[in-house]
Amino acid sequence: MPPIRGLYFFRSSSRLRAVRALGLDVGSKTIGIALTDEAGIAAHPLTVLERAGNSGDATTIAAMVAQNGVTDVVVGMPYELSGKVGHRGRQVQQFIKVLAAAIAPLEIHEQDERFTTAEAERVLIEADVSRAKRKAVIDQQAAALILQTWLDAYRKRTESR
């Protein structure tokens, strides 16, 4: 489906809607954050948030959601290699519950994040980013990969309807 007036529209149920999504790579110390462009086609690294507890983080992210006109939030789920939800995954699920209350009625989508940090590191190395700079931006780059993966799959599902 072609862009219309700078926005990419996705079919949702029986209606079309524009998508502006925020992607999160939730870690124990930081949260990498990415945002789609206004057309809803490409994900871009945005920032890294130092963790301030689930409630504080949810409040900060809710403000970003409002400020950027976000319609969907995508959270990377750290599944184990077996596909099961482990300790880290349960921590992320707890965060999702707190975030969901802060951004209601927006929907939160979970996206498998296995290997995204390794892929983000590979991308940054190929771009000849220094080790010190990589450390500062790896989480937001991983968030962008998580978000782009979800966006591509969502577009494909939507266009095939």
Regions found by a protein language model. Name each.
Residues 2-22, 28-161:
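Phosphate- and other anionic-substrate recognition elements at nucleic-acid/protein interfaces
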